[in-house]
Amino acid sequence: VFDEAFDAWGMAKRGGDYSQFFDADWEKDLTAFIKRDRPHPSVILWSTGNEIPERGGLNNGYSMATRLANAIRDLDASRPITNGICSFWSGLDDYMAEGKNQSQNVSDDITENVWERYTEAFTNGLDIVGYNYLEDLYERDHKMFPERVMLGSENFPKEIGYRWPLVERLPYVIGDFTWTAWDYLGEAG
């Protein structure tokens, strides 16, 4: 189990999501979450979130990322910590609806190490950096961060044939999760 604590932090992703409670309740809720799930051997990875708007440093995102990772380690240091980090481009759904290839967009959209510069401080507290739809950055990022362990934290099932050979070839990429190949009720909120 890739056990994700929060779908939103202090900045809303959708109306009615957890962001309205995050600042007041994150510590209490995270503690209850970890204590509830840590006895389960199926939990292999803790996640502080997925596609968090604060990933580029907004709303004290860098310091919150570190605080969350440290809080998890204080409760359970036996499992690695990650976060599913995506690009900064917000028009992805419209682009994909037009039938265009997402990985082509990512290559064009994220140039000159912009993603790396803005997310490096966000990833500093993580044991494994989750890459959502960013497999084109694996090799380049490995050159910039040779000690970084990477994970395809969210990718399309139809593209696993392209992505899995990267997992097999690149020893610093430890796996790939597809979105979605299981029952899913929808975004929180």
Predicted regions and their residues:
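Aromatic/acidic polysaccharide-binding cleft in carbohydrate-active enzymes
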Residues: P165-G189
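Active-site mouth of glycoside hydrolases
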Residues: V1-E139, K143-V149, E154-I160
